[in-house]
A protein has these predicted regions:
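Short, flexible, surface-exposed loop segments at domain boundaries
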Residues: 1-26, 47-91
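SH3/SH3-like beta-barrel fold
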Residues: 27-31
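Beta-strand/loop nucleic-acid-binding surfaces
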Residues: 34-51
Length: 91
């Protein structure tokens, strides 16, 4: 798998709600400058299988080569999500 097309977004989970199908969730993340929605599916890798919760600081990666709907706030398919502790960074 080529990771060079992956983009990282760091922010805090504001809400988690059911997605369009039984096996997806929509996570709204507030970054320093905007809100971003991520679709989390069974194909999304969550590091250490951490249970995602509201208020949790995360880094989410999405593939910029995949199509994304032209909506606001932006909505991406999350490929990988990891939780972050205070002042922790990931590259």
């Amino acid at each position: 798998m080529v990771y060079s097309s992956y983009q990282k977004i760091i922010g805090t989970i504001q809400s988690i709600r059911s997605g369009n199908s039984c096996c997806t969730q929509m996570i709204s993340v507030r970054t320093e400058s905007e809100m971003v929605d991520f679709v989390v599916s069974q194909d999304t890798e969550v590091i250490d299988n951490v249970r995602l919760r509201r208020g949790m600081r995360i880094a989410a990666f999405y593939d910029t080569n995949l199509p994304a709907p032209a909506v606001f706030p932006p909505q991406y398919q999350a490929e990988l999500i990891t939780s972050l502790r205070r002042n922790q960074e990931v590259t």
